Amino acid sequence: MARKLFIQTHGCQMNEYDSTRMVDLLESSHGLEPTDNPEEADVLLLNTCSIREKAQEKVFHQLGRWKKLKDAKPDMIIGVGGCVASQEGDAIRDRAPYVDVVFGPQTLHRLPGLITQAASTRELAIDVTFPEIEKFDNLPEPSVDGPSAFVSIMEGCSKYCTFCVVPYTRGEEVSRPVQPVLKEIQHLADMGVREVNLLGQNVNAYQGVGADGDTLDLADLIRLIRDIDGIDRIRYTTSHPVEFSEALIQVYEDVPELVSHLHLPVQSGSDRILAMMKRNHMVLEYKSKLRKLKRIRPDISFSSDFIIGFPGETDRDFEDTMNLIHDIGFDMSFSFIYSARPGTPAADLPDDVDMEVKKQRLAILQQRINQNVQDISRKMVGSTQRILVDGFSKKDPGQLKGRTENNRVVNFQCDDTDLIGKFVDVTIAKAYSNSLLGTDPRNPS
C-alpha cells in the first residue's frame, strides 16, 4: 500500500503554490500519495504563514492536534515549513519537540533529504537557510489540477516595510530566469492549462535574466507569455505601488490576455501612516496610477490590502483611508487589525490604538468594502461575462462553475462536461453574496 502525504497550508497564494510543488516532489522522491485525511497519513506537513500573530499561534495549536496522531503512529513524520519555520525554528523545537522536520520557503526542494534524515536518526532535521533561487532548479515538472495554475516567478521582498516580516522569512527579492519560467508555463499549457497566475511577494519587481543575458521586467515577461499557445488569460499577484511602472501600465493596452482586475495593496489612505510604514509613496501617486489604468481599461476593477490600527493611527488617518476607498471603489479586499511582528521596526513603536477602536474601524471599513462588492456584483447582472469553466458547482452537481476576470465565481446550469477547461460566454442572471448565477453558455473556446 502506498504511503500517504497530508499537507495543510496557511497564508498566501505563494504558500499554496509551494504546497503543490511539495506534493510533486515527494511523490517523485518517496512515492507519497496525497490524502485529505491526516489520520491516514505517514507524513504530515504544515506550510505556515507568519504575517499575523494569530496565524502563528494557529501553527502550534495544529501541531498539538497532530501530536495525538503521532502518539498513535510513532513512525509518522511531522514537518513544519513556510515563514513560521524560517522565523521560529528554535521556538518550534522548544514548543513542539515531536516535530521531525523544519524547513524554510527557500529549502523545500531539500525536503526529501530532510525526511530521510529524520526517519533514520529520529532527530530533528532542520534547514531554514536562504539559497536564493536554487529550489526551482531541483523541482520536478509541476502537475496540473484544472485549467488554472500558479507559477512562481520570484521570491522574497527587498522593500522592508516597517510592519512586515517577509524580507526576514523569505529573504530579499530574487527573480527566476526567464526561460525556465516560460518552459514551466509551456508545460502547463501542454497539459491543458488556460490561465496562469504569476506569483511573487512583490511580483512587479521581477527582474529576470533573458535568453540573451539581458534583464526583463514583468511587462516584458507578460508579453512573452502572451505568445504561448493555449494561454488565454494572465493574472499576477501581489504588487507594490512603487514599482507599478509605466511599462506595466502600457501592457494593459497591448495584451488583452491580461485580466481587467488588479490587486494593488495600499495598506492605508494616510500619507503620514504610509511614511511610518516606509511604503515610499504617497496616496496621490497611488491614485494617479489607477486613473491611468482606468483610462486604458474603463471596466477594470481594483482590490487592495488594508492594515487597521497601525501605531499612531488617528481618526483623521482612518478617515483618509475611508476617503480613498470611496474614491477608488475597491472590490474584494483584505483587511486586518495591526499586530506587531517580532523583529520588525514597527514592533518598537508604541501600539497606542485601543483595541476596541481598532475593531470599530475594521468593522466600518469591511462594511464599506462589502457594500462595494455587492454593488459591483449587482451591476454585472445582465452583462455577458467570459468565464473559464473549472469544474462542478460545490452546491449543485448539476451546475458547472467558472471565474470571471474580476475573480467572481459563476455557477450555471449545464450538463456538457466538455466545457470544463474552456472559456464560455455566459449572461449573468442573478447576484448572490458570494457568487453569480449565469445562463445561456455559448461561444466555447
UniProtKB/Swiss-Prot annotation:
Major subcellular location class: cytoplasm
User: What cofactor(s) does the depicted protein rely on?
Assistant: [4Fe-4S] cluster
Q: Name one GO cellular component term.
A: cytosol
Task: Tell me which residues bind [4Fe-4S] cluster 1.
Answer: C12, C49, C83
So where does [4Fe-4S] cluster 2 get bound? C157, C161, C164
Q: Which GO terms describe its molecular function?
A: 4 iron, 4 sulfur cluster binding; metal ion binding; N6-isopentenyladenosine methylthiotransferase activity
Q: Which residues form the TRAM domain?
A: 378-442
Q: PANTHER family in the record, alphabetically?
A: CDK5 REGULATORY SUBUNIT-ASSOCIATED PROTEIN 1 (PTHR43020), MITOCHONDRIAL TRNA METHYLTHIOTRANSFERASE CDK5RAP1 (PTHR43020:SF2)
Protein name in UniProt: tRNA-2-methylthio-N(6)-dimethylallyladenosine synthase
Q: Which organism is it from?
A: Alcanivorax borkumensis (strain ATCC 700651 / DSM 11573 / NCIMB 13689 / SK2)
